Structures are given as C-alpha cells and as structure tokens.
Regions:
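C-terminal cap/substrate-recognition subdomain and adjoining C-terminal extension
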Residues: 3, 7-12, 33-38, 68, ...
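Short coil/turn segments at beta-strand junctions that form active-site/ligand-binding loops
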Residues: 73-75, 129-130, 194-199
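Eukaryotic beta-rich interaction modules
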Residues: 54-70, 111-124, 143-146, 183-187
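Acidic di-acidic motifs
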Residues: 80-82, 204-205
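Short, acidic loop-to-helix structural element flanking the phosphoryl-transfer center
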Residues: 105-133, 139-144, 175, 179
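Catalytic P-loop NTPase motifs of RecA-like helicase/translocase cores
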Residues: 85-87, 210
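Surface-exposed beta-strand-to-loop junctions
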Residues: 92-104, 122-126, 160-169, 192-194
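Non-catalytic pre-domain segments flanking phosphatase-related domains
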Residues: 1-81, 88-99, 114, 256-269
Length: 269
C-alpha cells in the first residue's frame, strides 16, 4: 500500500534503442539537420512514401498547395507525457514520486521554464488540430503532476483529451505496455473521419509512440505521419533544450507535405 507521503506513478516502459545497423541505415538517408544549442533535429527519409502519387494529384489539380493552411480537423497531434512534456525520470525514483521532495532554487527555475515551454507548445498545437496526451502512466498522474509542477497549463489541459493506455488496456494485455500504447492510438480512429485526417504528428521519448503513430496512420485513407522522438530519461536542462528546439521548428514540421521521421539528438562534435 502506498503511504500518504508518496505518490505511486507508472512511468512508460522503454523500448530498446535502434540497433547499430538500423542507425547506420537511417543515417545514410538523413537529408538535413536543424540545430539549436547543443541539440539538433535529425530528419530521416522514408524509403517508401506511399503517398507521393496522392500529393502529386493534389498539386496538379490545385486541390491543395504547399502554402495552403490545412483545416483544423485535418490534423491529429499526440503527445506522450512522461519525459516528453514532464521530466518524470528526474522527479521520480523507481517509479515513485515523493510529495515532500524538495527542489533546489535552480531546479525550481528550470521547472518554471519547462512549464512555459510546454504551455507554448500546447497552445500552438491546439490551434492546429485535435490534441491528445496518451500515457502509459496511471489515470490521475497527468492531472496530479500538472497541478504540482505546471499549474499554468491546467486550463489548456481541459481542452485536451488525456488517455491512460494502462488504464484502458492493462487488463486486456497484462504486462504488455507496448500493446497498451498501440491500442490507445488505434482508439482514435473511432473519433474522426478517416478520409479527412491528413496530418498525424506524434511526439514522445519511446519507440513505442513512434510505432503506434505509424500503425494509426496506416488506418487512414490518406495521411502524412510525422514522428518526433525525444531523448529518453532527460535531465532538466536536456528537456528544456529539446522543447525549445521543437517549439522553434514545429510549424515547419506541421506544414510539411511529406512523412517525417525525426529524432532529437546531441550534436556530433
């Protein structure tokens, strides 16, 4: 039983990183890098883009042009919570958060900066489409942790659908956190018109989110899938830099007319 001074949370299970062979394969296909400070966004080309003919048709018939602002309902944006928006690994030890934990004044300032960066990102994304937070944590963790660390974002969270993949699918798939995420993502196809949604953007620190995003995209008649993988278990400074970089480049990612596989990486020295 959890004591009153300790909050039990469930952090997303981590999938293993890409193998060296997979990394080398993707690095050969990397067309460009966008940098900021000591982090960069690595863009990786998909070997097969099944949407090319569709894009060409839209351009030729002038049904859609690169400068045309997509309709709001044509975009789904899915966030992970732990270690993507909230520095959960920093705030917890062994999956447990202690309510009486004390932060240094320096760390408190960094949490406040993170709060502003998360607020900026959520405000931007909610203007562009339907936003979801899908987490493998327990049902109340997003609400509790935002009240504790990010109170400024609470009003905007009320406009966002928050889903606990664990809460929805743990009984059906016990111990299989990968499948929880996939099923929670697929649940979204029941809430939208599969023929209208053309832009799916997935942001998370685990390969689970990236895989689930691609599986969801495959259910749509036509969709562009953009995945943005954050670094796992970031320190406060690291998450600040990652969010700054994504905030800076999000509009370009959103308006891109192709599938994108993006990883936030340290600059190579």
């Amino acid at each position: 039983m959890v004591s009153n001074n300790m909050k039990k949370v469930f952090i997303d299970s981590r999938s293993k990183e890409l193998t060296n062979e997979e990394k080398e394969k993707e690095n050969k296909n990397s067309p460009n890098i966008i940098t900021s400070s000591d982090y960069e966004l690595g863009f990786y080309r998909n070997e097969i883009d099944t949407r090319r003919s569709y894009i060409t048709k839209l351009l030729q018939t002038k049904v859609w042009t690169p400068n045309m602002k997509p309709k709001k309902h044509n975009c789904i944006i899915i966030f992970d919570w732990d270690d993507t928006l909230l520095p959960t690994s920093f705030l917890t030890r062994g999956g447990c958060f202690y309510e009486e934990m004390e932060l240094s004044s320096s760390d408190e300032k960094k949490i406040l900066e993170l709060q502003d960066l998360v607020l900026e990102l959520l405000n931007n994304t909610i203007e562009k489409g339907t936003v979801y937070i899908i987490t493998n944590a327990g049902m109340d963790w997003v609400k509790y942790s935002s009240q504790r660390f990010y109170p400024k974002i609470i009003p905007i969270l009320e406009k966002i659908k928050i889903v606990s993949a664990r809460g929805e699918y743990e009984k059906e798939f016990p111990g299989n956190s990968r499948q929880w995420k996939i099923e929670a993502f697929l649940m979204l196809q029941n809430t939208v018109n599969l023929k209208l949604v053309t832009n799916i953007i997935c942001l998370g620190d685990s390969l689970f989110e990236m895989e689930a995003g691609r599986i969801l995209a495959s259910r749509f008649t036509e969709a562009f899938i953009k995945t943005i993988k954050f670094r796992e278990a970031p320190k406060l400074d690291e998450l600040i830099k990652q969010l700054k970089l994504v905030n800076k480049q999000f509009n370009s990612i959103y308006s891109s007319i192709k599938n994108l596989t993006i990883r936030v990486e340290r600059k190579k020295k």
